[in-house]
Curated annotation (Swiss-Prot):
UniProt name for this protein: H repeat-associated putative transposase YhhI
Encoding gene (name): yhhI
Family affiliation: Belongs to the transposase 11 family.
InterPro entries linked: ISAs1_transpos, Transposase_11, Transposase_11-like, YbfD_N
GO biological process: DNA transposition
Pfam families reported for this sequence: DDE_Tnp_1, DDE_Tnp_1_assoc
Gene Ontology terms, MF aspect: DNA binding; transposase activity
Length: 378
């Protein structure tokens, strides 16, 4: 995952500025922005300040003939970049440097950039859908929608950009759509979808197939996990079965459907053992030939997108507090954060959390150079 490869892909992004007015190359501005975000920059002024402090370092990788651009120039140039071209470069870069694994679970989930709305221009907050490799903890693709409700139409567009052959694609209930299932199958992947309560017939079929008696004493393949933490105990039971004859009609509606899956969780407070545990039941459908244990692993991996991506973006990078709104800048800056997370996550030299890695990159040029060079990366 070397910076050189990334910059080769970024070099194809068109620069729409008038040539005679250009003082700072587009590639230099993007290089500066990426390095600054890796080092903890959260806005345009942070990026300018980083550049002024690290100009001699940056000249090892770019030209910077006219020094560091001011923050207004950085903001103006980045906001005019084509998001489609940027996402294309990002995905091609990840394909080039990230080895594919047929056992991978790709979690697709969306996140709203809360402060990206622009009241004065009547523009709502943007919603970014990410494809996350749970095996490698890397973002492998992203696409923007204007609202969460548009995920249904955006997910197929994102899938078009990805190589999902042999992978299991997981989504939340919003992505549980027949058209999406068919598209995943056509691209050689398998799906594992959470079933929506609004899907009446399918939801009812699950309720009839898995009554409370079956959940307490499963007759089908099952796998249980018990965990204790912070004074609480949770038992998670996973049940998987083939599609029974009485529900065979669903295999014509959902392409490739093979398994009905149920996840049951029993939560209790250890100090209050006399109380009945809180019970939650979730239904899933899958085209993959899953065992109960593999099903448990897959749905647990799906939540890595929350813990290893969204949490990092919000808590470590303060994405929700970012008020960058100009032009395409909010969407582009989201993608640059993904680049920074990928580069830092893949660094195996300094074994620390993302926040410490960012601080070290800001303070230690040798470490930043090591990260950019792909030193110690898989």
């Amino acid at each position: 995952m070397e910076l050189k490869k990334l910059m080769e892909h970024i070099s194809i992004i068109p620069d729409y500025r008038q040539t005679w007015k250009v003082e700072h190359k587009l590639s230099d501005i993007l290089l500066l922005t990426i390095c600054a975000v890796i080092s903890g920059a959260e806005g345009w002024e942070d990026i300018e300040d980083f550049g002024e402090t690290h100009l001699d370092f940056l000249k090892q990788y770019g030209d910077f003939e006219n020094g560091i651009p001011v923050h207004d120039t950085i903001a103006r140039v980045v906001s005019c970049i084509s998001p489609a071209k940027f996402h294309e470069c990002f995905i091609n870069w990840m394909r080039d440097c990230h080895s594919s694994d047929d056992k991978d679970v790709i979690a697709i989930d969306g996140k709203t950039l809360r402060h990206s709305y622009d009241k004065s221009r009547r523009r709502g907050a943007i919603h970014v859908i990410s494809a996350f490799s749970t095996m490698h903890s890397l973002v492998i693709g992203q696409i923007k929608t204007d609202e969460k409700s548009n995920e249904i139409t955006a997910i197929p567009e994102l899938l078009n950009m990805l190589d999902i052959k042999g992978k299991i694609i997981t989504t939340d209930a919003m992505g549980c759509q027949k058209d999406i299932a068919e598209k995943i199958q056509k691209q050689g992947g398998d799906y594992l979808f959470a079933v929506k309560g609004t899907q009446g017939r399918l939801n009812k079929a699950f309720e009839e197939k898995f009554p409370l008696k079956e959940l307490n004493n499963p007759e089908h393949d099952s796998y249980a996990i018990s965990e204790k933490s912070h004074g609480r105990e949770e038992i998670r039971l996973h049940i998987v079965c083939d599609v029974p004859d009485e529900l065979i009609d669903f295999t014509f509606e959902w392409k490739g459907l093979k398994k009905l899956c149920v996840a049951v969780s029993f939560r209790s407070i250890i100090a209050e053992q006399k109380k009945e545990p809180e019970m939650t039941v979730r239904y899933y459908i899958s085209s993959a030939d899953l065992t109960a244990e593999k099903f448990a692993t897959a749905i647990r991996n799906h939540w890595h997108v929350e813990n290893k991506l969204h949490w990092r973006l919000d808590v470590v990078m303060n994405e929700d507090d970012c008020k960058i709104r100009r032009g395409n800048a909010a969407e582009l800056f989201s993608g640059i954060r993904h680049i920074a997370i990928n580069i830092l996550t893949n660094d195996k030299v300094f074994k620390a959390g993302l926040r410490r890695k960012m601080r070290k990159a800001a303070m230690d040029r040798n470490y930043l150079a090591s990260v950019l060079a792909g030193s110690g990366l898989s």
